[in-house]
Amino acid sequence: MLNEQKCEACSIDAIALSKEEQQSLLLQLSDWQIIERDEIPQLEKVYKFKNFKQAWAFSNKIAELAEDEFHHPSILLEWGKVTITWWSHSIKGLHKNDFICASKCDALAIEE
């Protein structure tokens, strides 16, 4: 399972996942989508909560995950929702690390 894996160091010469690899890994996630911003594929999901405080607490858990994995997403915190966007900045695309971290986000959301 993806959430049991650990991120690997992703250097600038790492190879981004092919569209086929992305789609295969996406099948292992729930409600994530691949979007493009500035021609860079990114993995994104919106989590919904009952209030701002719960959303904030979840955001803090994601921040801790990011530090633990040394891989950092975009986190948009709003009233009752958090949008998480993963991509690998160094390769301007998606790496397996992004899917691993997305899966770990889902595991953290279940704990909420």
From Swiss-Prot:
How would you classify this enzyme at the top EC level? lyase
Q: What's the Enzyme Commission number for this chain? A: 4.2.1.96
* Keywords tagged on the record: Lyase
GO terms for molecular function, please? 4-alpha-hydroxytetrahydrobiopterin dehydratase activity
GO BP term (any one)? tetrahydrobiopterin biosynthetic process
Q: Would I find Transferase among this entry's keywords? A: no
* Gene3D superfamilies attached to this UniProt entry: Transcriptional coactivator/pterin dehydratase
By its UniProt entry, which PANTHER family does this protein fall under?
PTERIN-4-ALPHA-CARBINOLAMINE DEHYDRATASE-RELATED
What is the official name of this protein in its record? Putative pterin-4-alpha-carbinolamine dehydratase
Query: What species does this protein belong to?
Result: Vibrio campbellii (strain ATCC BAA-1116)
